[in-house]
Amino acid sequence: MNIHEYQAKEILRVCGVPTPAGFLVQEDTETSEIAKSLARLGGKVFAVKAQIHAGGRGKAGGVVICRSVEEAIDNTKKMLGMNLVTHQTSPAGQKVRKVYIEAGQSILKEYYLSMVVDRENAKVAIIASEEGGMDIEEIARSTPEKIKKVFVDLSIGISDFHARKIGFELGLSLAQIKQFTPLVKKLYALFVTRDASQVEINPLIANSKGEFIALDAKLNFDDNALYRHPDTLELRDLYEEDPKEIEAAKYNLNYIKMEGGIGCMVNGAGLAMATMDIIKYYGASPANFLDVGGGANLEQVTNAFKIISSDKHVAGILVNIFGGIMRCDIIAEGIVAAAKDIGLTMPLVVRLSGTNYSAGIKIIEGSGLNIVTASELDDAAQKIVKLTRKEI
């Protein structure tokens, strides 16, 4: 689960990590209230920052440095309600419903600092660079040697030497390392106790007073651990999530919206990814990732079809099911019932394999519906691509 920058910074402040003073503006906030809040903030420089769940805001015009109260108010009004398009949003962009305004900071140096789970090493990776800011992704690609990593064993926990090692590799002075070490340990404690999947400070700045301040913050949390953190779940912003993904979650369907034209319904994450790969191989693009799991019932199958077909970009659907625990005849009955229930008219190709697959194929072929069957995934992918291009 993702949260907004302003929410992440509130958590950081509670943990003792310094952040700039700021306040939130929403669509219904009066101009007079914005002016009063800016006056309380003080200073002559302000950062006006669009709050969306996507990176790349700075380069897309979602972060503006303003040098007067009037300029800050004007840019805030322009941002609210706009669709911000970044390299991490869809081509349509994400509507800005909230703006965060911060006091400007004097910046001597920008750093990058983050923590993620390194699955290969089964440890927490502390990742840092002496070149933080908007170009960190390009730096990681072009000069990977500038990205420093230290791994922390969860069974042992973090020690001063982990933070000091990173600090020395960043070229920090001894005085800076004395401040940097407790900051890193606080972030690690946050990462572990809140079941985070990512903690990112970019940039972490050193200011003219010699202090480290989190100028931007990104926190992601493990969805599977949210039951332990009701306070974190309260921070969820459904406006920032795809409505189809929210609907799919109600039926325990793992759905992720994509930008292609062929809808996919598959059981198993690995098989789903292989299905998307072969669709791309034959020149088309998947419209979604949808894993119905190993024991889908009629309700789940029906709602999976409804969710996929509600996407106006979907021109056809490919169903790829391997029957293990899930019997193919049962899933076939569900496919037929669902297709009839929603009045499915777009091309539908079904590939079944595994337990009772012959019986499943007979059910589909005897349904009287215009459903194309395939015995192999390669054949199924070619058929759905041709059908959506009207080549069959």
Swiss-Prot record:
| A GO biological-process term | succinyl-CoA metabolic process
What GO terms are given for molecular function? ATP binding; magnesium ion binding; succinate-CoA ligase (ADP-forming) activity; succinate-CoA ligase (GDP-forming) activity
Its GO CC terms are:
cytosol; succinate-CoA ligase complex
UniProt-annotated binding residues for substrate: N267, G324, I325, M326
Lineage, please? Bacteria, Pseudomonadati, Pseudomonadota, Alphaproteobacteria, Rickettsiales
Give the binding site residues for ATP: K49, G56, R57, G58, E102, Q105, E110
* Alphabetical list of InterPro entries matching this protein: ATP-grasp, ATP-grasp_succ-CoA_synth-type, ATP_grasp_subdomain_1, Succ-CoA_synthase_bsu_CS, SUCC_ACL_C, Succ_CoA_ligase-like_bsu, Succinyl-CoA_synth-like
Function statement? Succinyl-CoA synthetase functions in the citric acid cycle (TCA), coupling the hydrolysis of succinyl-CoA to the synthesis of either ATP or GTP and thus represents the only step of substrate-level phosphorylation in the TCA. The beta subunit provides nucleotide specificity of the enzyme and binds the substrate succinate, while the binding sites for coenzyme A and phosphate are found in the alpha subunit.
Q: What is its EC number?
A: 6.2.1.5
Q: Where does Mg(2+) bind?
A: N202, D216
Pfam families for this protein: ATP-grasp_2, Ligase_CoA
Quote the protein name from its UniProt record: Succinate--CoA ligase [ADP-forming] subunit beta
Q: Which cofactor does it need?
A: Mg(2+)
